[in-house]
């Protein structure tokens, strides 16, 4: 990973760049809501409304 590349892998990373904020990174299941990328991380944070 080069210095100017923010990420290499992860559900919110595409072509070594963060996916835009609001992009679904984990689809809702059962009573849980969708989880969304923040635009600042390669990780997929849990939706706070999911408990």
Curated annotation (Swiss-Prot):
A motif (Cell attachment site) lies at residues 29-31. GO terms for molecular function: toxin activity. The modification Pyrrolidone carboxylic acid is found at residue 1. Disulfide bonds join 7-16, 12-37, 13-42, 25-44. One of its GO terms (cellular component) is extracellular region. The keyword DNA-binding does not apply. Keywords: Cell adhesion impairing toxin, Disulfide bond, Hemostasis impairing toxin, Platelet aggregation inhibiting toxin, Pyrrolidone carboxylic acid, Secreted, Toxin. Inhibits fibrinogen interaction with platelets. Acts by binding to alpha-IIb/beta-3 (ITGA2B/ITGB3) on the platelet surface and inhibits aggregation induced by ADP, thrombin, platelet-activating factor and collagen. The disintegrin belongs to the short disintegrin subfamily. This is Disintegrin eristicophin. It comes from Eristicophis macmahoni (Leaf-nosed viper). The lineage of its organism: Eukaryota, Metazoa, Chordata, Craniata, Vertebrata.
